[in-house]
Amino acid sequence: MSRRNDSSENLTCSFCGKSQDEVKKLIAGPTVYICDECIELCNDIIAEESKLEEAMGPDVKKLPKPREIKDVLDEYVIGQDRAKKILAVAVYNHYKRIESMGKPSDVEMQKSNILLLGPTGSGKTLLAQTLARILRVPFAMADATNLTEAGYVGEDVENIILNLLQAADYDVERAQKGIIYIDEIDKIARKSDSPSITRDVSGEGVQQALLKIIEGTVASVPPKGGRKHPQQEFLKVDTSNILFICGGAFAGLDNIIQQRIGVKTLGFGADVKSKVEKKAGELLTDVTPEDLLKFGFIPEFIGRLPVLATLHELDEAAMVQILKEPKSALVKQYQKLFEMEHVKLKFTDGSLVAIAREALKRKTGARGLRSILENAMLDIMYEIPSQTMVKEVVISEDVIYNREKPIIVYESVAESA
């Protein structure tokens, strides 16, 4: 409602008492009025309370149950049901453990850090990001291949904590209840089974450096990033309650498991009678700490990641589902973009299968879907904003396979009239 009223009555805000002449806007309810200044004040109070709730971290009473966590994960990640159940239970127990720490107990609960094993593009990073979003906690990512021991050229492991602190807007309390995802963790495996005489600054040395922050230590972090120097004051961050999720493809681990359990993979010369045939991805579900030890991880590092979750390689059907079903599905995103131009975008079933098959050829998992779509959609997305009378665009499999132009349906003269 406008702040002015044609009647001679001078209206006032029911909350602060200011008249309509003293404020910019006066909004009417059934029997009350509220001014723009009071609305702004209410918004500030609500925002402040939200910040306070976030600073306290997830409340166990409000913490989603494992089933509820998995239900939300299902909206964003297709398949991988067992991995999602493992993650949901581990995360729920982690934050219950934090809540119980202030209470007297004769049982000491250890932190349940997680190791995710699965091929590239199977959803490891997306699972970790979605978990942080569900729980409303700060989230940071790091690439293990960039990490080196302190004193060597490369990224110091304590920079991971700095990234989390930045995600929490330098709120130490919030950061201490956050989630850190370390990708490509398999790349810091020791290069051989025997301890190296020479310094392995990007392998075993990094494992040793990560041990401290993963198990729980008080890390000294520069307040605004940058290099450490003696005169600098540091922020102290306790990592005891930070949940660490480490992920990797672990190429070659299936061979180690195969040797241990005596299973032959599919191929010429496989003994069908005495051996059970399994694909590489299926073998990873049988992984044990001993297999990871042989792969090149030190026993202490394996011990700090007690929860193991395996993700399977995505097949064609899963790829098609990923394209159209999740909340952030690429098909839905492109349809929304076209909708903004008042154009309907349709993908034929054949086109979705074609995109999935092309992605499988690239062996990059779901990660390859976007680049295939971007390439196929470039020309039509360039043209559509400049065209009028376009009603519908249809993407067929020929657009994907043969780079043909999409089918464009125009409005009839009668419709436009």
UniProtKB/Swiss-Prot annotation:
One biological-process term from Gene Ontology? cell division
Positions of Zn(2+) binding: 13, 16, 35, 38
Q: What are the protein's GO molecular function terms? A: ATP binding; ATP hydrolysis activity; ATP-dependent protein folding chaperone; protein dimerization activity; unfolded protein binding; zinc ion binding
- The positions annotated for binding ATP are 119-126
Record's GO cellular component terms? HslUV protease complex
Q: Which Gene3D superfamilies match?
A: 1.10.8.60, ClpX chaperone, C4-type zinc finger domain, P-loop containing nucleotide triphosphate hydrolases
**UniProt keyword annotations, A-Z:** ATP-binding, Chaperone, Metal-binding, Nucleotide-binding, Zinc
Location of the ClpX-type ZB domain: 1-54
Q: Which InterPro entries match?
A: AAA+_ATPase (IPR003593), ATP-dep_Clp_protease_ClpX (IPR050052), ATPase_AAA_core (IPR003959), Clp_ATPase_C (IPR019489), Clp_protease_ATP-bd_su_ClpX (IPR004487), ClpX_bact (IPR046425), P-loop_NTPase (IPR027417), Znf_CppX_C4 (IPR010603)
> Which SMART domains does this entry report, sorted A to Z?
AAA (SM00382), ClpB_D2-small (SM01086), zf-C4_ClpX (SM00994)
Q: Which domain of life is it from?
A: Bacteria
What the record says about family reads:
Belongs to the ClpX chaperone family.
Q: Subunit structure, per the record?
A: Component of the ClpX-ClpP complex. Forms a hexameric ring that, in the presence of ATP, binds to fourteen ClpP subunits assembled into a disk-like structure with a central cavity, resembling the structure of eukaryotic proteasomes.
Q: What does this protein do?
A: ATP-dependent specificity component of the Clp protease. It directs the protease to specific substrates. Can perform chaperone functions in the absence of ClpP.
The protein's name: ATP-dependent Clp protease ATP-binding subunit ClpX
Source organism per entry reads Geobacter metallireducens (strain ATCC 53774 / DSM 7210 / GS-15)
Gene (UniProt): clpX
